[in-house]
């Protein structure tokens, strides 16, 4: 027989004890410290093998205890309660209406409903079911009317706003303006005056400057005048001034281009201002383009400018002189360094050496002598140039070319090939030089070229010795010192070769 189950009360007490009892770790302390899997048991296999005490500690609870809240959560709940309290009080104030207001609203609704029922046609006959449904609908309608009566009444016209009828323009003036559409219809005027495309759309119907003063206001009708005077009160004085023929012609010429010049507008009201300050015009578009150079050149072209108006020549000259005196302190010509072709000569010499070195396997005497003449000429030009002789870049290029030339001349004087002797024929007029005389002349030419190289190396040494270390541009003193040391090493090596 199976044992009898424990009493109900004892089972509940045992379950509560098991729930509240702390749990132990699945691994013992020794295995947990070394992070190894514990097989369990008391003691476990690892503790039994090492003869270590096997102890199981309570499992640490992860996270916060139940029921605890963060400070931010409590603050957020407090703010939510504080925000909900004024809304509740405001809702209570809006919903609490007096009995008198509610009764008045219900009476108004009832009167309006009775008038609607009296004015509406009689409904068709209906059955009992229809009457029952109608009663339910009436109850719903009454409930809706009571709900609407409880709402505060809406203000139809706020006190600070005008009705729509006061804002909209009067219909008579608008139709009158549309009736006189001659202002917009300018087809005939376009045929007579082709320059009407340059005028804005609102001025397309204005008369041209060539018309007489008698029909100055013929284009403006009385409804248009009245509409302009009511809409813009300040323009009424201008309309009165337009009756004067002189003022009307001036205003017309200010709005439209004159017949004599179709390419630019003319403003007679600003003639005095234009003559005093900006009355100068360019004689042609090319002068305007060329005058954008340096200020002295632009001022030298003052004779090509043309002026218009009485006394404009004196005022224009005074304007030019004042502008030139003001700009003389602001714009100063920047002094330019003297231009030279040293860099171009050095680069050409280096390219020539490169081409000769690639095109000839065995250097011929005539080719070496011709190349030597070009290289030595560029080197002498660099030494004599006052602005480039102290630049390390140019000196390095010159030393590079002279070193290559020196190697060619030494090789040409040391070895003589059969191909060289066969191709190099020396003649003096009709006399052909050969044998010992030919060798003497060739040695003399090579020695003369070596002497020129020796002179060039000596001049380069003098130029390098005169250079002082100083900061120039973005080049540091250490970089200049290193370049100067390398240049001196190359010159020492070449001096040993030529025997300086």
Swiss-Prot record:
Region (Disordered): 79-168, 302-332
BP terms from Gene Ontology: positive regulation of transcription by RNA polymerase II
Stretches with biased composition (Low complexity): 154-165, 317-328
Keyword vocabulary terms for this entry: DNA-binding, Metal-binding, Nucleus, Transcription, Transcription regulation, Virulence
Induction summary: Expressed during canola infection. Expression is co-regulated with the other genes from the sirodesmin cluster and corresponds with sirodesmin production.
Stretches with biased composition (Polar residues): 304-316
Subcellular location(s) per record: Nucleus
GO molecular-function terms, A-Z: DNA-binding transcription factor activity, RNA polymerase II-specific; sequence-specific DNA binding; zinc ion binding
Knocked-out gene: effects: Leads to reduced production of sirodesmin PL and decreased transcription of sirodesmin PL biosynthetic genes.
Top-level lineage group: Eukaryota
Segments of the chain annotated as binding DNA: 28-54
Biased composition range(s): Acidic residues: 135-147
Pfam families referenced in this protein's UniProt entry, alphabetically: Zn_clus
A GO CC term attached to the entry: nucleus
InterPro entries, alphabetized: Stress_Response_Reg, Zn2-C6_fun-type_DNA-bd_sf, Zn2Cys6_DnaBD
Biased amino acid composition, Basic and acidic residues: 79-88
Function: Transcription factor that regulates sirodesmin production and contributes to virulence. Probably binds to the consensus motif TCGGN(3)CCGA found in the promoters of sirT, sirP, sirO, sirN, sirP, sirB, sirR, sirJ and sirQ.
The protein's name: C6 finger domain transcription factor sirZ
Organism per entry: Leptosphaeria maculans (Blackleg fungus)
Lineage: Eukaryota, Fungi, Dikarya, Ascomycota, Pezizomycotina
Recorded name of the encoding gene: sirZ
